[in-house]
Amino acid sequence: MARIAGINIPDQKHAVIALTAIYGIGKTRAKAICAAAGIAEDVKIRELSEEQIDKLRDEVGKFTVEGDLRREVTLNIKRLLDLGCYRGLRHRRGLPVRGQRTKTNARTRKGPRKPIKK
């Protein structure tokens, strides 16, 4: 297994799909990385030479991925909480942040229903 950005990349998958195992890299970015490294998208990771894997590592290194990206997202949410702005309050209360309705629905964010005790 090749190791890129601290993640073991699955050998048996195509390069584009394997790169999506890294947090912060989706299909579009994976295709761009493969193109920049000069690697065909349909080549499996186990068929790549060590030099090609190093090129992939260099290309992935240009982006914020994995732990750094998770930390950045967490700090952004923490900043909103500290500011006390509307979005921060919604995060604090565990409600939808982007204007979705909450009278019905929003169960994913709110969690399971709590029964009313009489």
From Swiss-Prot:
Q: Read off the InterPro entries from this record.
A: Rbsml_uS13_C, Ribosomal_uS13, Ribosomal_uS13-like_H2TH, Ribosomal_uS13_bac-type, Ribosomal_uS13_CS
Molecular functions (GO terms): rRNA binding; structural constituent of ribosome; tRNA binding
- Is Ribonucleoprotein one of the keywords? yes
Which SUPFAM superfamilies does the UniProt entry name for this protein? S13-like H2TH domain
Which GO annotations describe the biological process of this protein?
translation
Q: Which Pfam families match?
A: Ribosomal_S13
List the transmembrane segments. none
Q: Which keywords does UniProt give here? A: Ribonucleoprotein, Ribosomal protein, RNA-binding, rRNA-binding, tRNA-binding
Q: Which Gene3D superfamilies match?
A: 1.10.8.50, 30s ribosomal protein s13, domain 2 (4.10.910.10)
> Region Disordered: start and end of each range?
94-118
Write down what this protein is called.
Small ribosomal subunit protein uS13
What organism is listed for this UniProt entry?
Histophilus somni (strain 129Pt) (Haemophilus somnus)
